[in-house]
A protein has these predicted regions:
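Phosphate-end processing signature that detects enzymes handling 5′-triphosphorylated RNA
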Residues: 2-147
Length: 147
């Protein structure tokens, strides 16, 4: 599930983080390229808002650069922090940059649908935007920050 952020957690710099840039070669079906620090990944995603199947393939820097010339969206740039939360889960806090500056989202992935639906978010989480298509990374890369 995906949420806006009501308050940035304290001591953010103590958590592991990655610098991510990503763009979409296609939005239907979803085909994404991503650079996360020094890793390069091509992802193909299935349909669905909360539960989606993904196929990931590691690619090299040269392949990433070649595929970058084929994208149909702008690049999304963000810093992702991995923050442990209750229940042995991790919250992925994304702080967006460039044309999305000021946008913060947090996402939690669950082992099953029952745990997903019974999840009680920590106080620092804001509004649940899991079903709001404007906050999908594909929409952000096409249309920018929602009003």
């Amino acid at each position: 599930r995906k949420f806006l952020v009501a308050e940035i957690p304290e001591n953010l710099d103590q958590y592991p983080h990655n610098e991510i840039e990503q763009a979409y070669i296609s939005t239907s079906p979803t085909i994404r390229i991503r650079k996360s620090d020094s890793d390069y990944i091509l992802t193909i995603k299935g349909k669905g808002a909360v539960a989606r199947e993904e196929f990931e393939l590691s690619i090299n820097e040269e392949q990433y650069k070649n595929l970058s010339e084929k994208v149909e969206t702008r690049f999304v740039s963000k810093t992702r922090y991995i923050i442990p939360i209750d229940g042995g889960l991790n919250a992925e806090l994304d702080i967006y940059h460039l044309y999305l500056d000021g946008l913060l989202t947090v996402e939690v992935e669950f082992p099953d649908m029952a745990e997903c639906m019974s999840f009680v978010p920590p106080k620092w989480f804001g509004k649940d935007i899991s079903d709001d298509k404007r906050y999908k990374n594909t929409a952000l890369s096409l249309f920018g920050k929602p009003e």
